[in-house]
Amino acid sequence: MKKTDRKKLEKELDKLWSRAVISRDKACRYSNSTDRLSAHHIRSRRHAITRWNLENGLCLAWSVHFLQKANPELFHDRIIEIIGQKEYNRLKKISDQTYKWSLEELERIKEQLLEAINQNG
């Protein structure tokens, strides 16, 4: 698989991950709104090991997600409020590990994300 093919697969996984998070949560985890939903990575997507892990995502209304840029400290506090400090620390510990996914693993992740989307409708 060429590098461009890998990048295409990663982009596809990003979209599937987002759909899977939104289909799982169905509403903003902070406000319970169903208006203008987006999927948010709790730990940045730059951390490869947790980038497509559904535990590292939650559904937020755009108005809540907007706080990430407007007031990062308040936004971080809200994320902790939603998932709890213990869960945040667990995700942080995992995400701090360096990892390079093989192509076979990326294909397996794709299957898992599609399955999650199908299960949650």
Indicate where each model-derived feature is located.
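A short glycine-/small-residue-rich loop at the edge of a beta-strand within enzyme catalytic domains
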Residues: 8, 12, 52, 66
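Short, flexible active-site loops
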Residues: 2-6, 42-45, 61
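Histidine-centered nuclease catalytic patch
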Residues: 29-58, 68
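Short cysteine-rich loop/turn motifs with clustered Cys
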Residues: 13-38, 61
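Short Cys/His-centered divalent metal-binding micro-motifs
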Residues: 36, 57-85
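Positively charged, helix-rich recognition surfaces that bind polyanionic ligands
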Residues: 3, 14-18, 24, 67-77
